[in-house]
Amino acid sequence: MRRVAVKMNKICNDLRLLASGPRCGLGEINLPAMQPGSSIMPGKVNPVIPEVMNQISYKVIGNDLCVAMSGEAAQMELNAMEPVMAQCCFESADLLMNGFDTLRTLCIDGITANEEVCRRYVHDSIGVVTALNPVIGYKNSTKIAKEALATGKGVYELVLEHNILSKDCLLYTSPSPRDS
């Protein structure tokens, strides 16, 4: 159960990071709002359900330590600590089972992609030049990548600006259709 709790804790931390924002985080996904908002930042959606799972994970990991210490307390063929071991195991199983159900119904089922942010990340990524390399050549790719880093302009914008590809040709190399 400890291993499951550690993995679930990591997954929930990833959800929290992917949903961070609204302006200074990754903001790639939107979590369902479970509260009116953040007490210190109006309009922000706190990741309360992933945080609940984090807390459950910490409790399960603590219960695992209790089981380990209880096992260590055995003397010869007798372990008087079995009741607390059983209680910790049953509690952990109940916490995980209820937590998974809560996470699925109140969080996972309601997650949406923040398509605008994800699209912007892809189109503004310097890594896009790697996909263009076979089309525009290494020299042009290097030139565009360096200029994009120096100026903050997008790769597609610079390819058009330098007349390396036409807008129509560039659309065929894009991960998704673009209007601009």
Where are each of the predicted segments found?
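Internal glycine-rich alpha/beta core junctions
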Residues: 1-67
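C-terminal accessory/binding modules appended to enzymatic or scaffolding proteins
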Residues: 129-145
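Charged substrate- and nucleic-acid-binding regions of tRNA-handling and nucleotidyl-transfer enzymes
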Residues: 143-171
